[in-house]
Amino acid sequence: ATGLVTATAEGDPVLALSGQVKRSDLLRSSHQSMRNADLFAPITKYAAEVQDPDNVSEIIANAYQAAESGKQGASFVSIPQDVTDSPVNSEPIKPLVAPKLGPASPSDMTYLAHAIKEASLPVLLLGMRASSSDVTAEIRELLSVTELPVVETFQGAGIISHRQIDNFFGRVGLFRNQPGDMLLQHSDLVIAIGYDPVEYEPRNWNADGKARIIVIDDVPAEIDHNFQPETELIGDISQTLDILVPLLRGYQVAPGSKRYLEDLQAKLQDSDVPPAIADQKVLHPLSIVAALQERVTDEMTVAVDVGSHYIWMARHFRSYEPRHLLFSNGMQTLGVALPWAIAATLVRPGKKAVSVSGDGGFLFSGQELETAVRLHADLVHIIWNDGHYDMVKFQEEMKYGRAAGVDFGPVDFVKYAEAFGAKGLRVNKPSELGQVLDEAFATPGPVLVDIPVDYSDNAELGAAMLPDQIY
């Protein structure tokens, strides 16, 4: 269930097939009898149970279509044992051809181009549905001929390439206190492209509900008090952007806004610099991020688990290819990083993957090291180790003045890795970080690296938060 609700929240198309007791046992208190489809209905886009063998193909076809269409997500099909054993007399449904959308209305595109030119400081807010390869290419083309500033959500990471770095003002998500948040507050026109509220609730970046918003997407917006678009350009996003490019070619930010953007860009760059700490005993988060940044290449996939480390990574780790820096921002599912990294080595063969977790989150799926070893997955898993569920800990301390239920005993992660047949490494002091990471990245197959981390500066992560942002 956790995997499917994560897929639905994050917009990942998944089709799950499940066994079920035979139909005659469905209403009995028999072994393993439960209403599977009813259980999964609230957390999937489509959930059904096959009652007639001749309906199997129809149900599978509709489940597949639901998972792939609109806002993508999970579908679930339950198949009773006696249905599985029965002959099927009906013909299978022919392969589906997904409907193709055209661009948005020409009049709406003209309206948007005019609105951008009239605004003092328009900004693009790029979300997860803007991260497909074709949409990313059009966004990069648009930025090559305009000066439009850009903010990414965590799940929009990598849309901006090295060439558009001057247009980039960071990522926003979870806590409202970043340069990108300042830009959204200062802007008089937010163009939300492929943005989903689950990535970063509008109440966080548009608390007063006064932002002027125009949407470019392939699905209608989800409206609430803090997200009321002036207009929506609904259609194929890449085709819409392709038509917008000539309408906006040569656009420059208003002179009065350029100094503000220069100052904001300086803030963003300064925030990435690790602090100088004399006689450092345990590594600062920014030191770990910087060391990873030096070693991770653009073609590597980096999957990030949930925890304090994920906030530091989302804010400060730069990725320049779409869908190469992965976060679970919808459900914030603990344990996703290692399985995602294993999957990345399968869909991107020959490319090393990196997964990053806390010591608590790692133990939600650490057993998948066996899978990684069996598949010879070429990955490096980094554990930020502090002996706590720290993301919960620092928020409890901010809200209640103390923490409870967040501490656990030491785990020897090196021996844990070795027990599964993986290589285990540990950073025993800050000066060893570079050497240990070099060894890890040079080693083929699964490698686990245990890095002690100092989260003393975590209070800064939550600075200037709204009261209801503390979970």
State the predicted function of each range.
Residues V56-S57, G102-M109, G173, V282-P285, ...:
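A conditional alpha-helix N-cap/helix-loop micro-motif detector
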Residues A1-A254, D270, A291, R295-D298, ...:
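N-terminal alpha/beta PP-like core and its mobile active-site loop of ThDP/TPP-dependent enzymes
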Residues F76-D85, Y260-Q269, V453-A459, M465-I470:
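A short, charged, Gly/Pro-tolerant segment at domain boundaries
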Residues V215, A303, V356-S357:
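Generic enzyme active-site microenvironment
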Residues L264-P339, A344, K399:
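Active-site diphosphate/adenylate-binding microenvironment
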Residues S78, A303-D305, D450:
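Short beta-strand segments
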Residues Q20-V21, Q81-D82, M128-S131, G156, ...:
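Short glycine-rich anion-binding loops that position phosphate/pyrophosphate groups of nucleotides
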Residues L27-Q32, H162, F175, H186, ...:
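Thiamine diphosphate
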